[in-house]
Amino acid sequence: MQKTDFMDTNYGMEIVRATEIAALTAARLQGLGNHAGILNDSREAITKTLNRLAIEGGVINDRFAGRPEIFQLPATLGRGGQRMDLMAVPLEAYHSAADGRNNAASFAVIAREGAIQSVPNLSMYKLVVGPEAGEVIDINQPPIVNVKRVARALGKYTENVTVLILNQTRHRQLINEVRSCGARIKLIEEGEISGCMAAITGERADIYMGYGFAPEGALVAAAISCLGGYFEGKIFYENDRDRAQAMEHGIDDFDKIFRVEDLVRSREIAIAATGVTDGEFLEGVRFTANGAITSSFIARGETRTCRRLETRHFFDYKPVF
């Protein structure tokens, strides 16, 4: 297959259709308490939509791969064509979506084949800031130091810096340390990708910090390669099995600090996202009398172009699912 220029096709517009369908599917089950159903249905929906693309997309970094109770994304998506890397999170914060809480969204990334580093499904501590803060953060420094560095870079008082953290028991010490320097804290129950996007764009937060998943870290790195910003992440290994899992992904430095260039090796990349419930980054799906309205985001690495989309879907004319 002859390679084509990544610029020849607006892949962001192609994959945003998939995140829209996944979000619409999930929104139909919002608040009904069906946790497995909302996750599986959204995964099936994004699979069907991505399979329409004229690509051969290898799926990378699916956190639910190999779990028999979860609908499995195929190893390859698309109807044939240019070989690509694909990452898909059909429904982030699916527990929140099922319970009717905020910050659920759908994400997809497409890139030139070989551009995205595969990572093990392990815990990763992350620090994320937008481009205005620059490369001032250091994951090896205490949280207070990083908060003060970001405040200085942004020209803000420390008390005016907003730090976004997942509201989890293992973050108690982190939360207390950030509070001790007077910075504002915003806690979210789920949705670390949306939280990181809020910090990258600087719209509702200045810093994201805390533990999450390594596959989500790769997707955040993809977003930064499209938008600018800075990311540091460190995978945590509890035992030899974890280290063996990392080696299967070509990772043999177990103290490595991952940065964007370690996880994304090409600017030929695009990201799309659609909100399911109102969140830190995107508005959720709003149903109307004859359809729905979705809020989405697209960005492209080569041009740093980013778009906000409000799409009106009319189910009476041609239902999309």
Model features per residue range: what roles?
Residues M1-M87, I193, R267, G275, ...:
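N-terminal subdomain of lithium-sensitive/metallo-dependent phosphomonoesterases centered on the IMPase/IPPase/PAP
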Residues V109, E113-L187, A292-F297, E302-K318:
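Acidic beta-strand-loop-alpha-helix segment within the catalytic core
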Residues G78-A133:
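A generic, well-ordered mixed alpha/beta core segment in the N-terminal half of proteins
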Residues Q168-L174, R179-G210, A214-L219:
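A contiguous, surface-oriented mixed alpha/beta subdomain in the mid-to-C-terminal portion of proteins
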Residues M1-Q2, A199-P215, L219-F321:
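Oxyanion/phosphate-interacting regions
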Residues A75-G81, A97-R101, V128, R152-T158, ...:
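Solvent-exposed alpha-helices and their adjacent loops that cap or buttress functional pockets
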Residues P90-D99, A104, R172, I193-A198, ...:
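Short glycine/serine/threonine-rich phosphate/pyrophosphate-binding segments
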Residues G57-R63, L86-A88, A97-D99, S118-P120, ...:
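General beta-strand structural signal in soluble alpha/beta enzymes
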